[in-house]
């Protein structure tokens, strides 16, 4: 999304959010408030979507569920109207993760499927890999192991077409773990062992520096 047409002050706020997200929650929220206040004055949906999304993401990291839902829910129409589809898919992903953590699996699946729809429609392959992995993990939790395999294999296919992404081996490891679990719980022990060996090699490829739970991937 191109923000170059904005004033230097707004660009400074936007850059501040990018630099501080995930490391300085207080500063990120302050900058998002600046952006949001300005965007309301200007009736600017692009900036409103951006500010609400990154506020919601920050509250996710702070484990403030009410503010997370409030901000991300506000972000959805603005992100849709301003065509910020990458952030829109990520917003649905966070809503799904949080719903699952609260024990509301049906809502989680609805959010994931919305995210997946945007990824397919707008060719958001990197986010699409994450979403398919997360859906596969959710189906494993349901005990629907064939469905889990279906989505994990789709994640694998997408990943093989996008080998240049920095998270390649991290995603591959999560896929192998998910497929291994699917096979194990179906008593397909030889296949489960093969995925376990692949996962072990994956840890070696990444020297152990792996984000090993895709439900935390944003």
Give each language-model segment a name.
Residues 11, 50, 90, 130, ...:
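Residue register of alpha-helical TPR repeats
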Residues 33-40, 73-83, 113-123, 153-164, ...:
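Amphipathic alpha-helical segments of tetratricopeptide repeats
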Residues 7-8, 46, 86, 126, ...:
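Residue signature of alpha-solenoid helical repeat architecture, marking inter-repeat boundaries
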């Amino acid at each position: 999304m191109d923000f170059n047409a904005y004033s230097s002050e707004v660009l400074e706020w936007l850059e501040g959010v990018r630099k501080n997200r995930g490391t300085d929650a207080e500063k990120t929220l302050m900058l998002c408030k600046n952006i949001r206040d300005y965007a309301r004055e200007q009736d600017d949906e692009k900036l409103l979507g951006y500010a609400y999304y990154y506020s919601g993401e920050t509250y996710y990291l702070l484990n403030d569920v009410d503010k997370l839902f409030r901000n991300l829910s506000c972000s959805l129409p603005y992100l849709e109207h301003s065509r910020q589809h990458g952030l829109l898919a990520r917003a649905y992903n966070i809503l799904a993760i949080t719903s699952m953590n609260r024990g509301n699996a049906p809502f989680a699946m609805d959010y994931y499927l919305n995210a997946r729809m945007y990824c397919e429609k707008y060719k958001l392959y990197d986010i699409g890999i994450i979403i398919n992995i997360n859906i596969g993990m959710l189906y494993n939790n349901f005990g629907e192991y064939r469905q889990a395999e279906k989505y994990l294999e789709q994640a694998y296919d997408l990943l093989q077409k996008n080998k240049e992404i920095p998270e390649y081996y991290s995603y591959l490891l999560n896929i192998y773990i998910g497929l291994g679990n699917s096979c194990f719980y179906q008593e397909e022990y030889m296949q489960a062992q093969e995925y376990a060996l692949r996962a072990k090699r994956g840890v070696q490829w990444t020297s152990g520096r792996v984000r090993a739970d895709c439900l935390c991937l944003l």
